[in-house]
A protein has these predicted regions:
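Residue-level detector of secondary-structure boundary/capping sites
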Residues: 3, 82, 106-109
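Terminal substrate-recognition subdomain of acyl/acetyltransferases
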Residues: 21-67, 97-195
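Protein-protein interaction and targeting regions used for scaffolding, dimerization, and localization
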Residues: 1-20
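Extended, structured, electrostatic nucleic-acid-contact surfaces
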Residues: 69-81
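Conserved acetyl-CoA-binding loop-helix of GNAT-fold acetyltransferases
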Residues: 78-94
Length: 195
């Protein structure tokens, strides 16, 4: 079976993302993952080390619309290559059983690759299709209605381009268990605060 050039590019990008993802053991000694909860509507994750006061930041806010009660990424910035997926894994475990969704209006290319990787390559991360605000998929159920602006403008590859339901950004993701948080805790990297 021959694969096309576009499919080969997707495979290579996926492998590069997988190989570049950091694990807690890859980070400098003294690195801290600081989870700060501000009431019931915002959680910040700041990743710092003694030599780098800001390695990465991930901010999530409780969705104002249905979205199955998911937390929405409102800000994400990883200044260390491969740290983004580790921050997302840690945050999804931290908020479980709640799920997490991408920013509903704007998603960087790097973040889109992470969401696509979760959707296509991570059996340990669950994904659930969300509806749009018109209720096209589940007209009699409003809890899954969610803004799909990012999914609508997503530059999805292949024949499904333009179909918001095919975009990894149209889903809610959750990660049961504590594989990542357990490692952070055992390495003395996990810090929980109230804002």
């Amino acid at each position: 079976m021959l694969i096309g050039e576009a499919q080969l590019r997707r495979i290579i990008r996926s492998e590069l993302l997988r190989e570049s993802a950091k694990s807690p053991e890859d980070l400098p000694k003294g690195t801290k993952f600081i989870f700060t909860r501000y009431g019931d509507n915002e959680i910040d994750l700041d990743v710092k080390s003694p030599g780098n006061p800001m390695m990465g930041k991930l901010k999530i806010t409780k969705s104002h619309e249905g979205c199955e009660g998911a937390w929405e990424v409102s800000f994400s910035n990883a200044l260390v290559r491969g740290l983004g997926p580790l921050m997302y894994d840690a945050m999804m475990e931290f908020i479980y059983p709640d799920g997490m969704v991408s920013d509903r209006y704007s998603v960087s290319d790097a973040a889109r690759r992470v969401w696509k990787h979760y959707h296509s390559n991570r059996d340990d991360v669950h994904h659930q299709q969300l509806d749009n605000l018109k209720g096209e998929l589940t007209p009699d159920y409003e809890e899954d209605d969610c803004e799909q602006h990012s999914a609508n403008k997503d530059r999805a590859d292949g024949p499904n381009m333009g179909n918001w339901r095919q975009s990894p950004l149209s889903k809610m993701y959750s990660k049961p268990g504590d594989a990542t948080l357990g490692k952070l805790y055992s390495l003395g990297m996990f810090v929980r605060r109230r804002g």
